[in-house]
Swiss-Prot record:
Protein species of origin: Escherichia coli (strain B / BL21-DE3)
InterPro entries from the UniProt entry: Cpx_auxiliary_protein (IPR052211), LTXXQ (IPR012899)
Region (Disordered): 140-161
This protein's name: Periplasmic chaperone Spy
Compositional bias (Basic and acidic residues): 142-151
Amino acid sequence: MRKLTALFVASTLALGAANLAHAADTTTAAPADAKPMMHHKGKFGPHQDMMFKDLNLTDAQKQQIREIMKGQRDQMKRPPLEERRAMHDIITSDTFDKVKAEAQIAKMEEQRKANMLAHMETQNKIYNILTPEQKKQFNANFEKRLTERPAAKGKMPATAE
């Protein structure tokens, strides 16, 4: 049994090292003019960049958007430590307290509602700094995104039958 375990560990390490060597050979540096990948933070956030794609914003508009987003960021708060601990306590308790969990969820829903309201207000402020032509393009982009169905993450594309 010891030999089998040793063989397994040795082969795992060897394959892991081979994968690392292969990964090091195939990595390429990003082009100098490439846009950084936008996960959750960036110029305007994950979806704001798409929201303003092809609008040809002026520098003044970009600055106004930055200021609006900075104000929004200051308002958006992470759930308080007590709420996160309360949620953790519910999850890790020996028995599930449904009443306590529902009360915690209600609290979290209130906070989410307030955050969504602030988010929509921010988007409205940004929309209202656009020129009429930019608003027209913005609405066209919105309609285009509604009709284009994005591929489901992590799922295989449907095969044609």
